[in-house]
Swiss-Prot record:
Residues 1-21 are annotated as: Disordered. It comes from Homo sapiens. PANTHER family: CHROMOSOME 12 OPEN READING FRAME 71. InterPro entries: DUF4640. This is Uncharacterized protein C12orf71. The gene is C12orf71. It holds the Pfam family DUF4640.
């Protein structure tokens, strides 16, 4: 009996020490025991109050947090957008000229998330394609400029002279251009005044021709129309009696006496 009591005291002391460790440090006796011992611990009934103080949920939370952190690291390694963010941070640090070693860019470069070397090829491909497009557009622009210079060489030379010349030379060229414009203005006015004088002769002849045609048409009307009207009068005279005859017949027919009227008047039928 004494031996059994001593064994029970030793077990109680060990359980109390384990419970204290679990509460203070998060130590769980089940983690150090093998699988066979865990089954015995789970199947055995609760002997003392030490088992009730064990917080198993705390250990589960810790494992869940660790798993979430690992997943986030994997996602960051797989996401290409983080590359852009890192480049932005690096550019920001370079522009500001900050020597802070605790900046986010330095942390990302010196940390465990060394995923920058995974996507250099794709980024370089995109940048090279964009540069090629820009070069092509620039070449097209230069070709268009050459075409414009070929079509308008004088204006291109003048623009070049204006752009390359000094301010006094530019003033002289502008004054010469204005003087040439002033001299050309009276020449243009004289040319315009000469043109109506040349154009007056055909307009005068056209007016005379129109007057002659009008006089000829009026003479024809006066001579021909009366003769035509005289010829039409006898025809109308011959046609008039034929037209009056049916009117008379209709008039006589309208005045015939009907049989009812004869009975009323007393005439025999």
């Amino acid at each position: 009996m004494a031996y059994s009591s001593s064994n029970s005291d030793i077990e109680d002391d060990s359980s109390k020490s384990n419970s204290n460790l679990s509460l203070s440090v998060g130590y769980f006796p089940c983690e150090d025991t093998p699988c066979e011992d865990t089954t015995s611990w789970e199947d055995a009934p609760s002997k003392g109050p030490s088992i009730h103080f064990l917080p198993p949920v705390q250990g589960a939370w810790g494992t869940e947090r660790i798993g979430r952190r690992m997943k986030r690291q994997d996602q960051i390694q797989d996401e290409p957008e983080q590359f852009c963010k890192l480049s932005i941070f690096l550019a920001w640090d370079v522009d500001i000229g900050s020597d802070n070693t605790d900046s986010r860019a330095n942390r990302l470069l010196n940390g465990d998330n060394l995923w920058i070397d995974k996507l250099p090829k794709e980024r370089t491909k995109l940048s090279v394609g964009k540069l090629n497009n820009l070069v092509q557009e620039f070449q097209i622009f230069l070709e268009n400029l050459k075409d414009d210079d070929a079509v308008f060489p004088e204006t291109a030379q003048q623009d070049f002279q204006l752009s390359s010349g000094s301010p006094p030379e530019m003033v002289q060229m502008i004054s010469q251009a204005t003087a040439s414009q002033r001299t050309s203005a009276p020449e243009i006015s004289s040319i315009l005044s000469e043109q109506p004088e040349k154009d007056d002769t055909p307009s005068h002849t056209q007016a005379q021709c129109c007057l002659n045609f009008g006089w000829a048409f009026s003479w024809l009307r006066q001579r021909i129309l009366p003769s035509l009207l005289r010829r039409d009068h006898p025809v109308n005279a011959t046609k008039s009696p034929h037209r009056s005859a049916p009117t008379k017949r209709l008039f006589h027919r309208g005045k015939r006496i009907q049989p009812q009227e004869t009975l009323e008047l007393g005439h025999p039928i």
